[in-house]
């Protein structure tokens, strides 16, 4: 009781000379010293003594970077600070807990790639021993004793230069620090996605203050739940001063979807930017997006991330199963040499490499093969009018290129891709999902396509050699349906995305009326806006045949029919190349 009375007396004594206006001034100067930003409190400030000294303030703001569009980096409807008594007597503010409601955080980057969240961190005392630097509470920094952060009803907006604003809502978030450990429980919402991150890690506060100045070891034991599916994150991070961070992380899940994560990872990972990034002015006119990929969020580090997901959700198709790989990080290079997963009843394997990702033009290469599956096995059954039956499929790819965006990458790419599809039946709506280019091709070769509900496919092969962003198709794309043999030739410029594709369909009977309407057609325009044009060479050839038919009383037409019957076209066999030339066996 005596100790309690003494503590209460000390609290009363400390509070007896605390003037809210003076405390506001002290807090403002402390924030300015710690962050380089101005703190303003325009609402009422109140003080309570028990169970600890607590200051509650309303309508608070912290200033933004000078170049930012919003004058405030942070605003709060209300903030409550639990303050340590004894440091206060000597003129220092040490905060054990911060409770926040109605938080608005405005994150933004400028044209130089700088983020407005780059606050000036307090420097650790040079005289502190390394093993004490991350745990000492006597450095004189304002928030060094912060143990708990509770946030309610928060809204975080992020805007990259020349991009639309992205918004994350935090209904609640709590981060507690005790005995060198952090307890984390965060609920977040982004677009149609809900996220919860829960678990324990090394002290976030200690890691922040000691990073790059003292040795840091941070263990991770977290559960990320995304739209009801959970991913276990375990491992450790080791950072020594003047050296690159090292880490070993494991990601394990019974079932997880990566599609929602892609939408929120860019925003959530933005706080991990270490400095200026390469700017890129995107153009929205391309089929392959010209928006910059978030290479600047990849860590410059040495380490590995081992991924083991039993069922991986993939957009618009059945999930992959037994998805496994290990990402190896080495400076600004990432390699995945053991990528494997099951697709349908088949298997896929491959390798991926990203290098020089801190440069203006990262290099990317990927190769692999998927086989022993069918389109029927991977097409979801959500739409009864877009079904597929059969269609055994094999795919191989070996492509390398460079660039900051998908468009830059394909415009500089070289390599080859091959797809082979066997006998099957394709609903019209399934074909329509192939996009404008596929629909344009089918319309061109079969004017009755729109009136039919299903296409009977005997085979289809597409071999696409790529050299410096140019796809040259020389009878290397072929289709065979129950009625037609179809061969495509021409080119695709992946830089301009211009199309120059000639279509050569013939009746499987080998008979012709003398006028090959398909031979008169070509696909022009761009991948984003394909159009049907006129094949001038086909027009000339057809005109000659028609003219000769009139002159010879139909003998030239009969000759064409005889020639067609004698030389049967085999589009798939002609188009197919050796699989080992694309993805050598044994890889």
Task: Please place each PLM-identified region on the residue numbering.
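Elongated, acidic membrane-bridging lipid-handling scaffolds
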Residues: 124-217, 283-329, 457, 466-468
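Secondary-structure transition motifs
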Residues: 37, 58-173, 245-300, 424-452
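Amphipathic hydrophobic-ligand
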Residues: 36-40, 66-83, 95, 162-175, ...
């Amino acid at each position: 009781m005596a100790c309690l009375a003494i503590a209460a007396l000390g609290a009363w004594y400390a509070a007896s000379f605390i003037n809210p206006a003076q405390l506001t001034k002290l807090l403002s100067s402390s924030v300015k010293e710690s962050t380089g930003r101005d703190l303003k409190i325009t609402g009422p400030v109140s003080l309570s003594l028990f169970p600890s000294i607590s200051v509650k303030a309303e309508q608070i703001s912290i200033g933004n970077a000078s170049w930012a569009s919003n004058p405030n980096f942070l605003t709060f409807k209300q903030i409550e600070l639990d303050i340590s008594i004894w440091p206060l007597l000597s003129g220092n503010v040490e905060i054990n807990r911060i409770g926040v409601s109605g938080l608005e955080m405005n994150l933004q980057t400028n044209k130089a790639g700088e983020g407005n969240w780059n606050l000036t961190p307090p420097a650790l005392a040079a005289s502190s021993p390394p093993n004490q630097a991350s745990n000492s509470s006597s450095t004189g920094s304002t928030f060094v004793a912060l143990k708990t952060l509770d946030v309610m009803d928060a809204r975080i907006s992020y805007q990259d230069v020349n991009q639309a604003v992205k918004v994350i809502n935090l209904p609640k978030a709590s981060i507690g620090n005790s005995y060198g450990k952090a307890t984390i429980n965060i609920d977040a919402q982004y677009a149609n996605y809900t996220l919860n991150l829960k678990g324990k890690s090394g002290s976030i506060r200690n890691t922040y203050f000691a990073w790059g100045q003292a040795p840091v070891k941070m263990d991770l034991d977290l559960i990320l739940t995304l739209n009801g599916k959970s991913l276990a994150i375990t491992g450790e991070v080791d950072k020594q001063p003047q050296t690159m961070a090292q880490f070993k992380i494991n990601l394990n899940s019974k079932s997880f979807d990566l599609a929602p994560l892609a939408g929120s990872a860019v925003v959530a990972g933005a706080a991990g930017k270490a400095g200026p990034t390469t700017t890129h002015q995107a153009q929205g006119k391309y089929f392959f997006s010209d928006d910059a990929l978030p290479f600047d969020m990849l860590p410059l580090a040495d380490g590995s991330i081992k991924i083991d997901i039993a069922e991986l959700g993939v957009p618009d198709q059945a999930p992959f199963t037994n998805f496994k790989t290990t990402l190896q990080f080495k400076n600004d290079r990432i390699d995945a040499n053991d990528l494997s997963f099951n697709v349908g009843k088949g298997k896929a394997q491959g390798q991926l490499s990203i290098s020089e990702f801190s440069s203006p033009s990262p290099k990317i290469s990927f190769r692999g093969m998927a086989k022993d599956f069918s389109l029927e096995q991977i097409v979801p059954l959500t739409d009864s009018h877009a079904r597929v039956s059969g269609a055994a499929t094999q795919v191989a790819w070996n492509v390398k290129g460079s660039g900051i965006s998908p468009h830059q990458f394909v415009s500089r790419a070289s390599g080859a891709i091959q797809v082979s599809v066997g006998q099957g039946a394709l609903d019209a709506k399934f074909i329509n999902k192939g996009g404008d280019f596929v629909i344009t091709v089918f319309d061109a070769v079969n004017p009755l396509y729109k009136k039919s509900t299903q296409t009977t496919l005997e085979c289809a092969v597409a071999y696409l050699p790529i050299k410096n962003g140019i796809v040259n198709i020389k009878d290397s794309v072929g289709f065979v349906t129950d009625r037609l043999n179809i061969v495509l030739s021409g080119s695709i410029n992946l830089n301009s995305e211009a199309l120059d594709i000639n279509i050569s369909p013939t009746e499987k009977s080998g008979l012709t009326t003398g006028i090959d309407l398909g031979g008169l057609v070509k696909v022009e325009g761009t991948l984003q806006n394909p159009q049907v044009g006129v094949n001038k060479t086909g027009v000339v050839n057809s005109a000659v045949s028609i003219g000769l038919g009139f002159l010879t009383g139909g003998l030239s037409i009969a000759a064409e029919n005889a020639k067609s019957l004698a030389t049967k076209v085999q589009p798939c066999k002609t188009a197919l190349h050796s699989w080992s030339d694309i993805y050598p066996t044994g890889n």
